């Protein structure tokens, strides 16, 4: 058996190797733990190049304009998954087209999902009775604010929901949700 010369032997000692191994493992674990945190603050967007989020049905399938209008009539307000997966109402206007805005269905009082009451022609919160008109403006408390607005755009038959940052047309104030 031949012996290696001192030039052929690596210069890293056992202690240095264990320190490097420990540091590498700790770094890997820390980065792995930080990934979900970073993903929470910077979620991936579903949607087209316009920066919107694809509106999705209850099964998570993207909604198309033609498919939606085939099953929803004028005046209809139905829930979809909108921005950040929040329940959002798509509104079919009097002309039979999807409206230019949607309404976040989360009550501004305690966060309950507010259903549309077609008989009363308004949104009525089941938790504490807050009421909102057809455009989501609060008309009876205890909810302090109107429902949040979202832009609804159609791109290549896909229904996209986008952040609303302009003045709230219902109150002529800056949006509280932006």
Curated annotation (Swiss-Prot):
Miscellaneous notes: The Rieske iron-sulfur protein is a high potential 2Fe-2S protein.
HAMAP family in UniProt: Cytb6_f_Rieske
Subunit structure: The 4 large subunits of the cytochrome b6-f complex are cytochrome b6, subunit IV (17 kDa polypeptide, PetD), cytochrome f and the Rieske protein, while the 4 small subunits are PetG, PetL, PetM and PetN. The complex functions as a dimer.
The EC number(s) this enzyme carries: 7.1.1.6
Keyword terms of this UniProt record: 2Fe-2S, Disulfide bond, Electron transport, Iron, Iron-sulfur, Membrane, Metal-binding, Thylakoid, Translocase, Transmembrane, Transmembrane helix, Transport
Record's keyword annotation contains Thylakoid: yes
Molecular function in Gene Ontology: 2 iron, 2 sulfur cluster binding; electron transporter, transferring electrons within cytochrome b6/f complex of photosystem II activity; metal ion binding; monooxygenase activity; oxidoreductase activity, acting on paired donors, with incorporation or reduction of molecular oxygen; plastoquinol--plastocyanin reductase activity
Gene3D superfamilies per the UniProt record, alphabetical: Rieske [2Fe-2S] iron-sulphur domain, Single helix bin
Enzyme's top EC category: translocase
Cofactors demanded by this protein: [2Fe-2S] cluster
Disulfide pairings: 112-127
UniProt cofactor note: Binds 1 [2Fe-2S] cluster per subunit.
UniProt domain Rieske: residue ranges: 65-161
GO terms for cellular component: plasma membrane-derived thylakoid membrane
UniProt main location, coarse: membrane
Alphabetized NCBIfam families for the sequence: Cytb6fFeSPetC, PRK13474.1
InterPro entries from the UniProt entry: Cyt_b6_f_Rieske, Rieske_2Fe-2S, Rieske_2Fe-2S_sf, Rieske_Fe-S_prot, Rieske_Fe-S_prot_C, TAT_signal
Native organism taxonomy: Bacteria, Bacillati, Cyanobacteriota, Cyanophyceae, Synechococcales
Function according to Swiss-Prot or TrEMBL: Component of the cytochrome b6-f complex, which mediates electron transfer between photosystem II (PSII) and photosystem I (PSI), cyclic electron flow around PSI, and state transitions.
Membrane-topology annotation of the record: Single-pass membrane protein
Binding site for [2Fe-2S] cluster: 107, 109, 125, 128
Cell compartments where the protein resides: Cellular thylakoid membrane
Annotated family: Belongs to the Rieske iron-sulfur protein family.
GO biological process: photosynthesis
Annotated protein name in UniProt: Cytochrome b6-f complex iron-sulfur subunit
Membrane-crossing residue ranges in chain numbering: 20-42
Catalytic reaction equation(s): 2 oxidized [plastocyanin] + a plastoquinol + 2 H(+)(in) = 2 reduced [plastocyanin] + a plastoquinone + 4 H(+)(out)
